[in-house]
Design a protein with these regions (language model features):
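N-terminal accessory targeting/assembly segments
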Residues: 1-103
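Short, conserved glycine- and acidic-residue-centered signature motifs
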Residues: 17, 53, 116, 219, ...
Length: 339
């Protein structure tokens, strides 16, 4: 992004919701947005029409105009109808948490595989938005161009999306077949596969670089690794293949997670998974992210051996560290936890 686009960040807080404001703000700043203001509202439940209160939408519009913001991003997940209604009210671009994450994915994508996966994820995630747009535009009898999610009759839109999704999936299948051939070759050579996994920025790529003397990018914010890398690891008595993979994120939308299936396959085919947990974060974050990581690993690799690596322990002192480690051991009962 050559020029920093000004954005207002919004969050609707309802009972049981985990605040995401700081996470989304960090991602947006990593992409290149200038977050000029953050607004939040506590409610008993989401407004089905615009997520947040209608009066709050008017405030968002006023703040955006006063501060020159052309983008309004929600830390929440929005429906297609909510996005379109808010967009119409504020006359600006509206993003939700998942679209912000996808924008970061697009910025970080370096390989053909990751670019295809991101394109597929965006199509699948915004498909319902497009249908809603076509429906709403039809009701309003407005002319819509193909630049928006709609643009033509619903059946044509649906057919076009299905065709594009089919093409992307076919290309990803070809990449997956190629990876499967490489895995079969590794198995034939007798190399066990060790997969690194964990929440984004947990330190797994730093570990990968130091162990295999690689120079993958690190320290650029969330989701530096969007594709997998595999390197031969020389060990006393037995060599192995060390694989780095995409970082996990809490509550990633299932459609986005499914689009990265070829990447997660590297974990499912491993002989051993090393799960990195950043224990330097606050206790609640460590607990939530541990559960999120465990859920994903057990979904894609339910029977694979797992070792949990408590990372960044030098940043936590004394009894606090022991308390964090105790919580991790309880979460991953039955698995080895290091140290």
């Amino acid at each position: 992004m050559s020029e920093r686009v000004k954005a207002v960040l919004v969050e609707c807080l309802v009972p049981g919701y985990t605040p995401r404001m700081e996470e989304v703000k960090s991602v947006m700043e990593t992409i290149g947005y200038d977050v000029v203001d953050c607004l939040s509202q506590k409610r008993d439940d989401y407004d089905p029409a615009v997520c947040i209160g209608k009066g709050k939408v008017d405030e968002i519009k006023r703040v955006a105009q006063e501060k020159g913001a052309t983008v309004v991003a929600f830390a929440n997940t929005l429906t297609g109808g909510q996005v379109l209604r808010i967009q119409k009210k504020i006359s600006g671009k509206v993003l939700d948490r998942n679209l912000v994450i996808l924008e970061l994915f697009e910025k970080r994508a370096m390989t053909r595989e990751s670019k295809l996966q991101i394109g597929l994820a965006r199509l699948l995630y915004t498909y319902g938005w497009g249908r809603e747009s076509v429906r709403m535009k039809g009701i309003e009898k407005e002319q819509v161009g193909p630049g928006g999610p709609g643009g033509y009759p619903f059946q044509v839109y649906e057919k076009d999306v299905r065709k594009r999704v089919s093409k992307l999936r076919a290309e990803l299948r070809r990449i997956r077949r190629h990876k499967e051939m490489l895995r079969a070759r590794r198995e034939k050579l007798g190399f066990p596969v060790v997969a690194l996994s964990g929440y984004t920025q947990s330190g797994k790529t730093t570990f990968f670089n130091r162990v295999v003397l690689e120079e993958k990018q690190i320290g650029l914010g969330p989701f530096t690794t969007l594709s997998t890398s595999a390197k031969l690891l020389r060990l006393p008595g037995k060599d192995a293949i060390l694989v780095d993979s995409i970082g996990f994120v809490e509550d990633m939308h299932p459609l986005i997670l499914d689009a990265f299936n070829t990447t997660l396959t590297e974990i499912s085919s491993a002989d051993l998974v090393l799960l990195f947990v950043d224990v330097s974060e606050d206790e609640a974050s460590v607990f939530r992210k541990s559960l999120a990581s465990k859920k994903i690993i057990r979904r894609v690799a339910p029977s694979t051996d797992l070792i949990v690596c408590a990372n960044k322990i030098d940043l936590v002192k004394g009894n606090l560290l022991e308390k964090r480690l105790m919580g991790i051991r309880e979460t991953f009962e039955g698995s080895i936890v290091l140290p």
